[in-house]
Protein backbone atom coordinates (compact mmCIF):
# COMPACT_ATOMS: atom_id res chain seq x y z
CA UNK A 1 0.00 0.00 0.00
CA UNK A 2 1.43 3.42 -0.92
CA UNK A 3 2.58 5.70 1.88
CA UNK A 4 1.10 9.17 2.06
CA UNK A 5 3.16 12.10 3.30
CA UNK A 6 1.79 15.48 4.30
CA UNK A 7 3.67 18.79 4.26
CA UNK A 8 2.51 21.90 6.06
CA UNK A 9 3.87 25.39 5.74
CA UNK A 10 2.68 28.86 6.58
CA UNK A 11 2.96 31.76 4.15
CA UNK A 12 2.38 35.14 5.81
CA UNK A 13 2.14 38.37 3.86
CA UNK A 14 4.32 41.01 5.56
CA UNK A 15 4.07 43.73 2.91
CA UNK A 16 1.24 45.91 4.20
CA UNK A 17 2.72 49.42 4.15
CA UNK A 18 -0.31 50.93 5.88
CA UNK A 19 -3.04 51.02 3.25
CA UNK A 20 -3.27 47.33 2.40
CA UNK A 21 -3.86 46.54 -1.25
CA UNK A 22 -5.57 49.86 -1.98
CA UNK A 23 -3.51 50.19 -5.18
CA UNK A 24 -1.10 48.07 -7.22
CA UNK A 25 1.89 50.16 -6.11
CA UNK A 26 0.66 50.66 -2.54
CA UNK A 27 1.85 47.38 -1.05
CA UNK A 28 4.98 45.27 -0.96
CA UNK A 29 5.06 41.67 -2.09
CA UNK A 30 7.10 40.69 0.99
CA UNK A 31 6.12 37.49 2.73
CA UNK A 32 7.56 34.89 5.03
CA UNK A 33 7.51 31.14 4.46
CA UNK A 34 7.71 29.14 7.65
CA UNK A 35 7.13 25.79 9.26
CA UNK A 36 7.58 24.64 12.82
CA UNK A 37 11.17 24.19 13.97
CA UNK A 38 12.90 25.67 10.92
CA UNK A 39 14.25 29.11 10.01
CA UNK A 40 11.82 31.26 8.05
CA UNK A 41 12.46 31.95 4.37
CA UNK A 42 11.99 35.56 3.24
CA UNK A 43 9.79 35.60 0.16
CA UNK A 44 8.58 38.09 -2.42
CA UNK A 45 7.56 38.10 -6.05
CA UNK A 46 9.97 38.21 -8.97
CA UNK A 47 11.39 41.74 -9.37
CA UNK A 48 9.62 41.86 -12.75
CA UNK A 49 6.39 41.89 -10.72
CA UNK A 50 7.44 44.52 -8.15
CA UNK A 51 9.20 42.01 -5.91
CA UNK A 52 12.26 42.39 -3.73
CA UNK A 53 15.32 40.89 -5.48
CA UNK A 54 16.89 40.12 -2.08
CA UNK A 55 14.10 37.66 -1.25
CA UNK A 56 13.25 34.27 -2.71
CA UNK A 57 10.42 34.24 -5.23
CA UNK A 58 8.12 31.28 -5.99
CA UNK A 59 9.74 30.67 -9.36
CA UNK A 60 13.22 30.36 -7.82
CA UNK A 61 11.86 28.08 -5.12
CA UNK A 62 10.29 25.80 -7.74
CA UNK A 63 13.54 25.58 -9.69
CA UNK A 64 15.49 24.93 -6.47
CA UNK A 65 12.96 22.31 -5.37
CA UNK A 66 13.40 20.32 -8.58
CA UNK A 67 17.18 20.59 -8.36
CA UNK A 68 17.30 19.58 -4.71
CA UNK A 69 14.95 16.62 -5.18
CA UNK A 70 17.03 15.32 -8.10
CA UNK A 71 20.27 15.77 -6.15
CA UNK A 72 18.98 13.90 -3.10
CA UNK A 73 17.80 10.95 -5.20
CA UNK A 74 21.07 10.93 -7.16
CA UNK A 75 23.16 10.89 -3.96
CA UNK A 76 21.04 8.07 -2.55
CA UNK A 77 21.36 6.01 -5.73
CA UNK A 78 25.12 6.60 -5.90
CA UNK A 79 25.51 5.52 -2.28
CA UNK A 80 23.47 2.36 -2.89
CA UNK A 81 25.50 1.58 -6.04
CA UNK A 82 28.88 2.09 -4.34
CA UNK A 83 29.60 5.22 -6.38
CA UNK A 84 31.32 7.72 -4.08
CA UNK A 85 30.32 11.32 -4.79
CA UNK A 86 32.67 13.91 -3.31
CA UNK A 87 30.99 17.09 -4.58
CA UNK A 88 27.77 18.15 -6.23
CA UNK A 89 26.72 21.54 -7.52
CA UNK A 90 23.80 22.35 -9.76
CA UNK A 91 22.99 25.63 -11.47
CA UNK A 92 19.54 24.88 -12.89
CA UNK A 93 17.72 27.21 -15.24
CA UNK A 94 13.95 27.50 -15.36
CA UNK A 95 12.16 29.06 -18.32
CA UNK A 96 8.78 30.65 -17.76
CA UNK A 97 6.58 32.16 -20.45
CA UNK A 98 4.28 35.01 -19.54
CA UNK A 99 0.95 35.03 -21.36
CA UNK A 100 -0.85 38.07 -22.74
CA UNK A 101 -3.42 38.02 -19.95
CA UNK A 102 -0.66 38.36 -17.32
CA UNK A 103 -0.56 34.70 -16.34
CA UNK A 104 2.15 32.31 -17.35
CA UNK A 105 3.68 28.89 -16.98
CA UNK A 106 7.02 27.16 -16.91
CA UNK A 107 7.97 25.62 -20.22
CA UNK A 108 11.10 23.81 -19.02
CA UNK A 109 13.65 23.45 -16.28
CA UNK A 110 17.16 22.31 -17.15
CA UNK A 111 19.24 20.80 -14.35
CA UNK A 112 22.98 21.18 -14.89
CA UNK A 113 24.68 19.18 -12.14
CA UNK A 114 28.44 19.11 -11.86
CA UNK A 115 29.49 16.06 -9.85
CA UNK A 116 32.86 15.04 -8.42
CA UNK A 117 33.66 11.38 -7.78
CA UNK A 118 36.24 9.71 -5.52
CA UNK A 119 37.32 7.60 -8.48
CA UNK A 120 36.98 9.21 -11.92
CA UNK A 121 36.05 5.83 -13.45
CA UNK A 122 32.87 5.88 -11.35
CA UNK A 123 31.61 8.82 -13.40
CA UNK A 124 30.67 6.37 -16.15
CA UNK A 125 27.65 5.24 -14.10
CA UNK A 126 26.52 8.83 -13.51
CA UNK A 127 24.32 9.11 -16.62
CA UNK A 128 22.40 5.97 -15.67
CA UNK A 129 21.99 7.15 -12.07
CA UNK A 130 20.89 10.64 -13.15
CA UNK A 131 18.25 9.02 -15.37
CA UNK A 132 16.99 6.88 -12.50
CA UNK A 133 17.02 9.86 -10.10
CA UNK A 134 14.86 11.77 -12.56
CA UNK A 135 12.41 8.86 -12.76
CA UNK A 136 12.11 8.78 -8.95
CA UNK A 137 12.06 12.52 -8.19
CA UNK A 138 8.78 13.36 -6.45
CA UNK A 139 8.79 16.95 -7.65
CA UNK A 140 9.66 16.18 -11.29
CA UNK A 141 6.83 13.63 -11.28
CA UNK A 142 4.44 16.36 -10.10
CA UNK A 143 4.98 19.07 -12.72
CA UNK A 144 3.44 19.36 -16.20
CA UNK A 145 6.49 20.62 -18.07
CA UNK A 146 9.77 18.98 -19.11
CA UNK A 147 12.63 18.72 -16.65
CA UNK A 148 15.92 17.96 -18.40
CA UNK A 149 19.12 16.79 -16.79
CA UNK A 150 22.21 18.01 -18.64
CA UNK A 151 25.21 17.04 -16.46
CA UNK A 152 28.23 19.29 -16.85
Regions found by a protein language model. Give the residues of each.
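Extended beta-strand/beta-hairpin segments
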Residues: 1-64, 72-152
